[in-house]
């Protein structure tokens, strides 16, 4: 008889239950944390800090962030495409040592005195290390000189305000000035609501610049990647002479759930994905990320 039961008997107590054993038994369920580790098979996860690890939203595998960066921001398990920053896009597409950034000092004002907009801009600048949501300039793709602009989703969701619209317009006008092709990589949640009509005006402004490119007889390559939506889709992003995208990129105006609730119909499978748009004739080429630079160069070589 256990010590606990002897004590209970001496005190005249009944219904005393011994505490449950705390050590593991055969068939005992694993903790949630142990299940996660077993499921994702992450090596040396105990030695990694939380901010050093990223979980793939597609396959669930945990990977070291440095591994993802070294793999062109792709999951090494399922090839899911993580978003690239504007500078990473520049490094991917432009020959090393040839990029010259333009319009570096342009920053947004607060044209309609939207509450807390200035604070949001400052936070986005601090978090992203950028002045605004697009980087533009001149560079070379396999020796071919181009004017390029790359948007960044990390800066307020890649939203297009007055400065983003101005820098994209300037990139197209710079192409006309130098008589070279223009390449714009679009990734955006749409027009920046904090700037009201000023942001909506950028749709017309950038579209007019595309028209100038066309009148000058110069090629404009648009590269909408995941996600490209709203006013950016409804303006310059879908006006390229050739539109190139990455696999499974979502490109559309409103989100699919909003559309389904509006029309009260089920949307087709892969709706708004780049493959679906290619079937409908709205995207010309789908290129894997590792082939994107070579694809743009080949297209430009063929049409110049």
Swiss-Prot record:
Q: In which pathway does it act?
A: Lipid metabolism; malonyl-CoA biosynthesis; malonyl-CoA from acetyl-CoA: step 1/1
- Cofactor, free-text remark: Binds 1 zinc ion per subunit.
Cellular compartment(s): Cytoplasm
Cofactor section? Zn(2+)
Q: Name one GO biological process term.
A: fatty acid biosynthetic process
- Gene Ontology CC: acetyl-CoA carboxylase complex
Instruction: List, for all copies, the residue spans of the domain called CoA carboxyltransferase N-terminal.
Output: 52-304
Q: What is its main location?
A: cytoplasm
Which reactions is this enzyme annotated as catalysing? N(6)-carboxybiotinyl-L-lysyl-[protein] + acetyl-CoA = N(6)-biotinyl-L-lysyl-[protein] + malonyl-CoA
The protein's Enzyme Commission number: 2.1.3.15
| NCBIfam families associated with the record | accD
Q: How does it assemble?
A: Acetyl-CoA carboxylase is a heterohexamer composed of biotin carboxyl carrier protein (AccB), biotin carboxylase (AccC) and two subunits each of ACCase subunit alpha (AccA) and ACCase subunit beta (AccD).
Q: What is this protein called?
A: Acetyl-coenzyme A carboxylase carboxyl transferase subunit beta
What lineage does the source organism belong to? Bacteria, Fusobacteriati, Fusobacteriota, Fusobacteriia, Fusobacteriales
* Gene from which the chain derives: accD
């Amino acid at each position: 008889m256990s010590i606990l039961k002897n004590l209970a008997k001496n005190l005249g107590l009944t219904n005393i239950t011994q505490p449950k054993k705390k050590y593991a038994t055969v068939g005992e369920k694993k903790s949630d944390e142990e299940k996660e580790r077993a499921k994702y098979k992450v090596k040396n996860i105990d030695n990694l800090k939380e901010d050093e690890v990223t979980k793939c939203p597609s396959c669930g595998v945990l990977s070291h962030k440095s591994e993802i960066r070294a793999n062109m921001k792709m999951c090494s398990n399922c090839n899911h495409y993580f978003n690239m920053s504007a500078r990473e896009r520049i490094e991917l597409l432009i020959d090393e040592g040839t990029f010259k950034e333009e319009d570096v000092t342009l920053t947004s004002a607060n044209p309609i005195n939207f509450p807390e907009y200035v604070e949001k801009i400052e936070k986005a600048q601090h978090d992203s290390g950028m002045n605004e949501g697009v980087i533009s300039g001149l560079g070379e793709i396999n020796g071919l000189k181009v004017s390029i602009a790359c948007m960044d989703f990390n800066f307020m969701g890649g939203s297009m305000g007055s400065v983003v619209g101005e820098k994209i317009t300037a990139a197209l006008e710079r192409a006309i000035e130098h008589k070279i092709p223009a390449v714009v990589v679009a990734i955006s949640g749409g027009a920046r609501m904090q700037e009201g009509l000023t942001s909506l005006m950028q749709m017309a402004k950038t579209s007019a610049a595309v028209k100038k490119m066309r009148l000058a007889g110069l090629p404009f390559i648009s590269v909408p990647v995941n996600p490209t939506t709203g006013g950016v889709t409804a303006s310059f992003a879908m006006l390229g002479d050739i539109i190139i995208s990455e696999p499974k990129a979502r490109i559309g105006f409103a989100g699919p759930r909003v559309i389904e609730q509006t029309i009260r119909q089920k949307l087709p499978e892969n709706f708004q994905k780049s493959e679906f748009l290619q079937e409908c004739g709205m995207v010309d080429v789908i290129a894997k990320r590792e082939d994107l630079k070579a694809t743009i160069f080949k297209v430009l070589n063929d049409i110049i």
